[in-house]
Amino acid sequence: MLRFLRHIPPFLPTLIVLVAICYLSLDADPFPDKDSWFTFPGSDKVVHIIMYGGLTATFCFDYYRRVAAPCKLWLLIVALVGIVMELLQAHMGIGRTGDFVDVIANSLGALIGIVVGNRLFTRLFIKVES
């Protein structure tokens, strides 16, 4: 399986996840059905944590495939992406609002993603190469 993973173009998985997050963040109404089973107070914050945690873990995956070293810089990069998305939501006039609590959720997701990504991919890539 690792041979297959090494043939994926560099940072393609990260780009795919980033484009999906941009679409979901900047579309006026990406989920028109507000009465789904997943809707509860604070559910949007859970979604932010999952999205940005997934983005950071994907960055770690791509980084480890090439470098096989911890990727702490991605925490800052993904947190900045989250801040930029919230600023764009606030100022683009698309019917969305930027929210400081969303920035916190994005950053928390990035932190969780870096911890999970570093632990998971250290074991996956570094043990195999040793």
Which residues make up each language-model segment?
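Short, charged juxtamembrane terminal tails flanking transmembrane helices
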Residues: 124-130
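Small-polar-interrupted transmembrane alpha-helices in polytopic inner-membrane proteins
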Residues: 13-25, 73-91
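Interfacial helix-loop-helix junctions of multi-pass membrane proteins
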Residues: 32-36, 85-111
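Membrane-interfacial alpha-helical segments at the cytosolic side of multi-pass membrane proteins
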Residues: 51-65, 109-121
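Short helix-capping/hinge motifs at transmembrane helix termini and TM-loop junctions
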Residues: 26-28, 64, 93, 121
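Residues within alpha-helical transmembrane segments of multi-pass membrane proteins, especially transporters
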Residues: 27, 58, 80, 84, ...
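Membrane-helix interface segments
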Residues: 8-9, 66-73, 96-100
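"…centered on the first transmembrane helix and the immediately adjacent amphipathic helix/loop
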Residues: 1-61
